[in-house]
């Protein structure tokens, strides 16, 4: 699939690192942490190597976003657990990390006629209102992803749980456009 290989833009994952957190303690110990419960019920903490951001909640749950691959998610969550342990906050060992969403981009390297694609894919499978949004929204059942198709030939795939889901979504689009003679 060299002509349309994906680039992962964002991985969102969640885990439970403890039974509960005192977010004011974490905010006071983690440089750059932001916590204002009047504005948002969680603490925001950004890391740079690898780059990611955390939303940390009093329930002990943590959401990691901004990572560029699944391995980085595991790395930064492991680093977060170590940092919490270093300030005396006990964390769970081997927490289960669940990927919630992967956003990826791809390029078909050709100009696309979105009106023809909308008709070809069937209006029941797509949303296309160019006055409101320049892309065609295509919901695929297998893999269960949403692909935004742009006239530039660029694609954005969202909803995947694995990089393979995103690759498969791009391949489904490529095959269908090819079958319609639109590639």
Swiss-Prot record:
Sequence repeat feature ranges: 8-84, 99-177
Function, in words: General factor that plays a role in the activation of archaeal genes transcribed by RNA polymerase. Binds specifically to the TATA box promoter element which lies close to the position of transcription initiation.
Top-rank taxon: Archaea
InterPro entries recorded: TBP, TBP_archaea, TBP_CS, TBP_dom_sf
Gene3D superfamilies: TATA-Binding Protein (3.30.310.10)
The name this protein goes by in its record: TATA-box-binding protein 2
Organism in which the protein naturally occurs: Methanosarcina mazei (strain ATCC BAA-159 / DSM 3647 / Goe1 / Go1 / JCM 11833 / OCM 88) (Methanosarcina frisia)
Gene Ontology biological process terms in this record: DNA-templated transcription initiation
PROSITE patterns: TFIID (PS00351)
Cystine pairs: none
């Amino acid at each position: 699939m060299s002509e349309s290989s994906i680039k992962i833009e964002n991985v969102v994952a969640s885990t439970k690192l403890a039974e509960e957190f005192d977010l004011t303690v974490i905010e006071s110990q983690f440089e750059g942490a932001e916590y204002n419960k009047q504005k948002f019920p969680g603490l925001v903490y950004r890391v740079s190597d690898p780059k990611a951001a955390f939303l940390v909640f009093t329930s002990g749950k943590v959401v990691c976003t901004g990572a560029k691959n699944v391995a980085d998610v595991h790395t930064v969550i492991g680093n977060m657990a170590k940092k919490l342990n270093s300030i005396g906050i006990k964390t769970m060992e081997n927490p289960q990390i669940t990927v919630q969403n992967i956003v990826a981009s791809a390029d078909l390297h050709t100009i696309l006629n979105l009106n023809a694609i909308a008709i070809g894919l069937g209006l029941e499978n797509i949303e296309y209102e160019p006055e409101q949004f320049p892309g065609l929204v295509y919901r695929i059942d297998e893999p269960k992803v949403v692909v935004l198709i742009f006239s530039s030939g660029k694609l954005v795939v969202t909803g995947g749980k694995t990089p393979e889901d995103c690759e498969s979504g791009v391949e489904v689009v490529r095959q269908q456009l090819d079958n319609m003679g639109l590639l």
